[in-house]
Amino acid sequence: MRRILSILLIMFCFCVSQGQEFRCNVSVNYQKLMTTTQAYESGGDKKVFENMKQALEDFINGTKWTNIEFEQQEKIECSFSLILNQRTSATDFVGQITIQMKRPVYNSTYTTGLFNYMEQPNFQFAYNESMPLEFDLNNFSSLLSSTLAYYCYVMLGMYFDSYSLYGGQPFYETAQQVVQAVDVAKYSGWDSKGGRNRYWFMENHINSAYSDLREAYYNYHRLGLDMMTKDQPKARQAIIAALQNLQRAHKRSTSMLSLQQFVDVKIQEIVSIFTPAPDQEKKQVYELIKDISPINVVKLKGFNTK
């Protein structure tokens, strides 16, 4: 924790670094291609998919995404799952991405979910196992590498926001650059059309109108979870403050993708934290969740006290 906080003080300084930022586990599920006629010719060639998994893992874990030096034990734990639904040519695929990330909680062995997001099942991309994945922020290389880079910067933004107020700003700005470099006329999911895509997920974090969402990450994690072993009542109040942040953000936009992602990831944890809390706090949490994410109210059984 102390090293993470010290990193935040020097994160804008250039330094030579040895280790990369992520410890990401990648899985590629190709079962549909083995059992349907959608598989293109060599759709049953397992080696292609094994190479794809390794290429994605090497790209995420081997790329230097920041100028910050991470020790081995400080690397960010995440997972990237790709379910392949179609293979339309030797190098063209359609699939669905799921990304998850965890964050350690100070002075404990507990890790908390920070990001858990499943995209729509229409991710179209090209992968040629004879060509390495490359990424250049200034020049578009491929949809696959840009998508991976986008989520790496988003995860860095969330991670550092959870340690320092608006600490993830430079990474969100870089993710925005990735979005802007993609040809939206050619690739879907990167422009303002629709509400559940990469453009809007980034807009929710980069637009100052939704700063309460960013503050919620800090209040919930740094002032809440990280302080649980020191002062539980005060830590719970910080988590309530985070929910109030989300409530204010929700009032500005009732369809914020990032806000719903936050609540979906945290709801079971919130239940565990406030189950032993005073009834007044339970009632307060219930009313906030009812306003922010009505679909999750059913998980707060017993919180609506009289």
Q: Which ranges hold each PLM region?
A:
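Bacterial Sec-dependent N-terminal signal peptides
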Residues: M1-C24
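Start-of-domain marker
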Residues: Q20-V94, N107
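A cross-kingdom marker for long, charged
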Residues: N25-N29, Y217-K306
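Soluble non-cytosolic domains of exported or imported proteins
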Residues: G43-N51, S142-T147, L257
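Sec-exported extracytoplasmic/periplasmic mature domains
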Residues: E57-W65, G157-D161, V271, T275
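Acidic/His-rich structured neighborhood in mature extracellular/periplasmic domains
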Residues: S89-E203
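Flexible, glycine-rich surface segments
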Residues: S164-S255
